[in-house]
């Protein structure tokens, strides 16, 4: 089950979460 789109969205979500966590530190 290799869907590049899903991987792309997951990476973007992780990136956004990391940004928020870093901003709140």
Swiss-Prot record:
Reaction equations catalysed: 3,5-dichlorocatechol + O2 = (2E,4E)-2,4-dichloromuconate + 2 H(+)
UniProt entry tagged with the keyword Iron: yes
Cofactor: Fe(3+)
Co-factor binding comment: Binds 1 Fe(3+) ion per subunit.
Enzyme's top EC category: oxidoreductase
GO molecular function: dioxygenase activity; metal ion binding
Induction info: By chemostress caused by the herbicide 2,4-dichlorophenoxypropionic acid (2,4-DCPP) and its metabolites.
Pathway: Xenobiotic degradation; 2-(2,4-dichlorophenoxy)propanoate degradation
Record-listed E.C. numbers: 1.13.11.-
GO biological process, one term: catabolic process
Keyword annotations: Aromatic hydrocarbons catabolism, Dioxygenase, Iron, Metal-binding, Oxidoreductase
Family: Belongs to the intradiol ring-cleavage dioxygenase family.
Name of this protein: Chlorocatechol 1,2-dioxygenase 2
Protein source organism: Delftia acidovorans (Pseudomonas acidovorans)
Organism ancestry: Bacteria, Pseudomonadati, Pseudomonadota, Betaproteobacteria, Burkholderiales
């Amino acid at each position: 089950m290799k869907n590049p789109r899903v991987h792309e969205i997951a990476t973007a979500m992780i990136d956004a979460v990391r940004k928020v966590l870093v901003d709140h530190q």
